[in-house]
Swiss-Prot record:
Its EC number is 7.3.2.1. It is an enzyme of class 7 (translocase). GO terms for cellular component: plasma membrane. Pfam families: ABC_tran. InterPro entries: AAA+_ATPase, ABC_transporter-like_ATP-bd, ABC_transporter-like_CS, P-loop_NTPase, PstB-like. The complex is composed of two ATP-binding proteins (PstB), two transmembrane proteins (PstC and PstA) and a solute-binding protein (PstS). This is Phosphate import ATP-binding protein PstB 1. The lineage of its organism: Bacteria, Pseudomonadati, Pseudomonadota, Gammaproteobacteria, Vibrionales. SUPFAM superfamilies: P-loop containing nucleoside triphosphate hydrolases (SSF52540).
Length: 249
């Protein structure tokens, strides 16, 4: 079953067309990797999935992005969409507050005040982000005291505290060391049991390790998408073969 169906999607930044007639299904509860060289459109597409591109002046979008059969560019509440489709950015962006308050922030913003409810969600979310055992004795400590990898997992915990259906990840490990990267990748493998994950990555090795599906973009076009194993071992398009072989990038 598909979580997203993208049909005939075009996106323009002013006169520059950044996405060209994209047609892509994104299956539920799997990891889909978006790959391609810098400027190919993969991050632009990712931002289409929760309408982050709306924040950029001069953007024009045509086509359909259906989430569970509903057009997200139709008559919907964008704030609700961004709860349902959470996002983890390239650089960890914990809020300037305690570990506990970071995770509880979204719930409090929605008016949740019951401490038992907040405590339960904070613990569940930190466990879900594989961070609880590392921070359970210092929840009141400032989030900036965590390592880079811990901060990124805290941001994941903050995202899943809002109970999204989808988690978008824009190069979430590019600023992390190999050990922290491995922990986040292990976490993605666990999270996909409950969430649909779409990740942008420049690392071919990472895409191959963690994703079920891979989509290759080049100059705003979707060249090919298939099972990850096929994309890396037997792609249909010579351009895909050249990219995964490292012939260009």
């Amino acid at each position: 079953m598909n979580k997203f169906n993208i049909e005939n999607l075009d996106l323009f930044y002013g006169q520059n067309q950044a996405l060209k007639n994209i047609n892509l299904p994104i299956p539920a509860k799997q990891v889909t990797a978006l790959i391609g060289p810098s400027g190919c459109g993969k991050s632009t597409l990712l931002r289409c999935l929760n309408r982050m591109n709306d924040l950029i002046e001069g953007v024009k979008i045509t086509g359909l992005v259906n989430l569970d059969g509903n057009d997200i560019y139709g008559n919907i509440d964008v704030a609700d969409l961004r709860i349902k489709v959470g996002m983890v950015f390239q650089k960890a962006n914990p809020f300037p507050m305690s570990i506990y308050e970071n995770v509880a922030y979204g719930l409090k913003a929605q008016g949740v005040k019951d401490k038992k409810v907040l405590d339960a969600v904070v613990e569940k979310s930190l466990r879900g982000a594989a961070l609880w055992d590392e921070v359970k004795d210092r929840l009141k400590s400032h989030a900036f005291g965590l390592s880079g990898g811990q901060q990124q997992r805290l941001c994941i915990a903050r995202t899943i505290a809002m109970e999204p259906d989808v988690i978008l990840m824009d190069e979430p490990t590019s600023a992390l060391d190999p050990i922290a990267t491995h922990k986040v990748e292990e976490l993605m493998e666990t999270l996909k049991k409950d969430y649909t994950i779409v990740i942008v990555t420049h690392s071919m090795q990472q895409a191959r390790r963690i994703s079920d599906k891979t989509a290759f973009f080049l100059m705003g076009e979707l060249v090919e998408h298939d099972d990850t194993q096929i994309i890396f071992s037997n792609p249909k398009d010579d351009r895909t073969q050249g990219y995964v072989n490292g012939d260009f990038g």
